[in-house]
């Protein structure tokens, strides 16, 4: 694994038994369960990521492939695969495995799966190649992905992630806050998606 040279790489501890952590992942499971049958598949997630989000963001075929590879690796670590239906208990157990795996890499300043995904996303919406994204670029992604459908929620996310107060977001800041939000319940990452995700 490559060194990320992250200035935010510190040991973070998960809190898997906290009902808030479980509810956060239940919300995401339901968000991903497009047809509401209580099961999700990697097919559904990749279709949303590639056919919907990447296409609407104007990703090139190379960017879409890189993004799809990152999404596949991330969700396969949770235990998902093509054609395999996963119910919530297995999904949340898979998140625990993923969190432990990624947090260990993060504490060693090595590239995690969430960082790979973040880099793939940044490559798509960092249109000017500056290595950072603006609030407007983040708002566009939030609307297209559905994760920050209101400007207010997108602005809250942006503020939470702008750790160096530069008015721009880089992938290192986004990775740190997403680790804190999805993996550990770090209070510094609470409200990452505004009022949309608990």
Swiss-Prot record:
Ca(2+) 1 binds at residues 33, 35, 37, 39, 44. Ca(2+) 3 binds at residues 162, 164, 166, 168, 173. It comes from the Eukaryota. Residues 1-9 form a propeptide. Coiled coil: none annotated. GO terms for biological process: bioluminescence. Ca(2+) 2 binds at residues 126, 128, 130, 132, 137. Pfam families: EF-hand_5, EF-hand_7. One of its GO terms (molecular function) is calcium ion binding. Ca(2+)-dependent bioluminescence photoprotein. Displays an emission peak at 470 nm (blue light). Trace amounts of calcium ion trigger the intramolecular oxidation of the chromophore, coelenterazine into coelenteramide and CO(2) with the concomitant emission of light. This is Clytin. It comes from Clytia gregaria (Gregarious jellyfish).
């Amino acid at each position: 694994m490559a060194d990320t040279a992250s200035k935010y790489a510190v040991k973070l501890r998960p809190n898997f038994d906290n009902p808030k952590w479980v509810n956060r992942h239940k919300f995401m499971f339901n968000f991903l369960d497009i047809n509401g049958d209580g099961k999700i598949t990697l097919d559904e997630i990749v279709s949303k990521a590639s056919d919907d989000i990447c296409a609407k963001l104007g990703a090139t075929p190379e960017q879409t492939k890189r993004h799809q590879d990152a999404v596949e690796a991330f969700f396969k670590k949770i235990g998902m695969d093509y054609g395999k239906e996963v119910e919530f208990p297995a999904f949340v157990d898979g998140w625990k495995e993923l969190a432990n795996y990624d947090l260990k890499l993060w504490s060693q300043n090595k590239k995690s799966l969430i960082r790979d995904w973040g880099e793939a996303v940044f490559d798509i919406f960092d249109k000017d190649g500056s290595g950072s994204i603006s609030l407007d670029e983040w708002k566009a992604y939030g609307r297209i992905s559905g994760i920050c459908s209101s400007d207010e929620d997108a602005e809250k996310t942006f503020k939470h992630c702008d750790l160096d107060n530069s008015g721009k977001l880089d992938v290192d800041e986004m990775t740190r806050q997403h680790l804190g939000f999805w993996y550990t319940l770090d209070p510094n990452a609470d409200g990452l998606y505004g009022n949309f995700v608990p």
